[in-house]
C-alpha cells in the first residue's frame, strides 16, 4: 500500500468480515494505530481513499481475481504451499502466484540472491521464508567473498500465530504446545537447508534450528561459519558494508549502532547486519548476527 509501484486490488479472507478488517488494520499491537484513513464504502475496504475488493472464499479456485484485474496473487495463508494447491488461484484469472513460504515443489527465489534464475514461464513460485530471506543474502556475501566450508544457524524467532498462550495439545510438536509467554521454545526450521536451494554452492553445508521467544516482532539470525579464506572480523564487516551500499542495497542493511530488537520494527530490509554483535574465534571461524 505504501509502494507506488504496487496497486493492491483485492484481498481474500474467509474468516473475518469487512468491519473487523477495518478494526484490525486500524489498530495494531506492534505497529501502533494506522495514521491514515480506513473505512467501508460500496462494500469495499477503503484505505487512504484506495478501494480494495474483498473476497471471502475458502477455496482459492473460487476467487475471481480476474474480475478486478489482479495479475499477481500473494498466497500467504500458509495452507496452499504446493504448486498444485497454489495453482488454484490461476483458475480465477490470476497470472502469477507468489507463495510467501517455503514450498516442497515450487521454484524458490530470494531477492538479491537468485532472481537471475527466474524464468517468466513460471506461474507459481515461492519467495521462501522470512528466516531464509534474512540468512541467504548474508550467506551469499560471505560465500562469494571468503567461501563457506560449513555453518550452523540459529534463529531467535518472535512469536507466531500458531503458538499457544497457555499449554495445550500439539501432537506433532510437543514443545510447540507449551505456553509462549515465559518460555524459550526450541523448534525446527528448514531455513538453513533452504539456502542450499537458492545458493547451490552451499547445498549440504548449512543447517540450523529455531528458538521461539516471547516477543511480538523482530527475529534474529545467528550464523556460525567456518571460512575457506582467512579473514579478520573487520574484513568481514567491510564485505557486508560494501554489499549493503552496493549491489544488495535495500536488501541488506548494515548497522554498527548499539541496537536492540524493537529498533528494527517496520524495517523493509530483508537482513540487517549487526556489526557490533558478531564475534570471531580465529580468522576461519566467526559468528555473524543479522
Swiss-Prot record:
<feature type="binding site">
    <location>
        <begin position="189"/>
        <end position="190"/>
    </location>
    <ligand>
        <name>D-glyceraldehyde 3-phosphate</name>
    </ligand>
</feature>
<dbReference type="InterPro" id="IPR020830">
    <property type="entry name" value="GlycerAld_3-P_DH_AS"/>
</dbReference>
<keyword id="KW-0963">Cytoplasm</keyword>
<dbReference type="Pfam" id="PF00044">
    <property type="entry name" value="Gp_dh_N"/>
</dbReference>
<feature type="binding site">
    <location>
        <begin position="129"/>
        <end position="131"/>
    </location>
    <ligand>
        <name>D-glyceraldehyde 3-phosphate</name>
    </ligand>
</feature>
<keyword id="KW-0520">NAD</keyword>
<feature type="site" description="Activates thiol group during catalysis">
    <location>
        <position position="157"/>
    </location>
</feature>
<dbReference type="InterPro" id="IPR020831">
    <property type="entry name" value="GlycerAld/Erythrose_P_DH"/>
</dbReference>
<dbReference type="GO" id="GO:0005829">
    <property type="term" value="C:cytosol"/>
</dbReference>
<feature type="active site" description="Nucleophile">
    <location>
        <position position="130"/>
    </location>
</feature>
<keyword id="KW-0324">Glycolysis</keyword>
<feature type="binding site">
    <location>
        <position position="58"/>
    </location>
    <ligand>
        <name>NAD(+)</name>
    </ligand>
</feature>
<dbReference type="GO" id="GO:0006096">
    <property type="term" value="P:glycolytic process"/>
</dbReference>
<dbReference type="GO" id="GO:0051287">
    <property type="term" value="F:NAD binding"/>
</dbReference>
<comment type="pathway">
    <text>Carbohydrate degradation; glycolysis; pyruvate from D-glyceraldehyde 3-phosphate: step 1/5.</text>
</comment>
<dbReference type="InterPro" id="IPR020828">
    <property type="entry name" value="GlycerAld_3-P_DH_NAD(P)-bd"/>
</dbReference>
<comment type="similarity">
    <text>Belongs to the glyceraldehyde-3-phosphate dehydrogenase family.</text>
</comment>
<comment type="subunit">
    <text>Homotetramer.</text>
</comment>
<feature type="binding site">
    <location>
        <position position="160"/>
    </location>
    <ligand>
        <name>D-glyceraldehyde 3-phosphate</name>
    </ligand>
</feature>
<dbReference type="Pfam" id="PF02800">
    <property type="entry name" value="Gp_dh_C"/>
</dbReference>
<keyword id="KW-0560">Oxidoreductase</keyword>
<protein>
    <recommendedName>
        <fullName>Glyceraldehyde-3-phosphate dehydrogenase</fullName>
        <ecNumber>1.2.1.12</ecNumber>
    </recommendedName>
</protein>
<feature type="binding site">
    <location>
        <position position="212"/>
    </location>
    <ligand>
        <name>D-glyceraldehyde 3-phosphate</name>
    </ligand>
</feature>
<dbReference type="GO" id="GO:0004365">
    <property type="term" value="F:glyceraldehyde-3-phosphate dehydrogenase (NAD+) (phosphorylating) activity"/>
</dbReference>
<feature type="binding site">
    <location>
        <position position="13"/>
    </location>
    <ligand>
        <name>NAD(+)</name>
    </ligand>
</feature>
<dbReference type="InterPro" id="IPR020829">
    <property type="entry name" value="GlycerAld_3-P_DH_cat"/>
</dbReference>
<dbReference type="InterPro" id="IPR036291">
    <property type="entry name" value="NAD(P)-bd_dom_sf"/>
</dbReference>
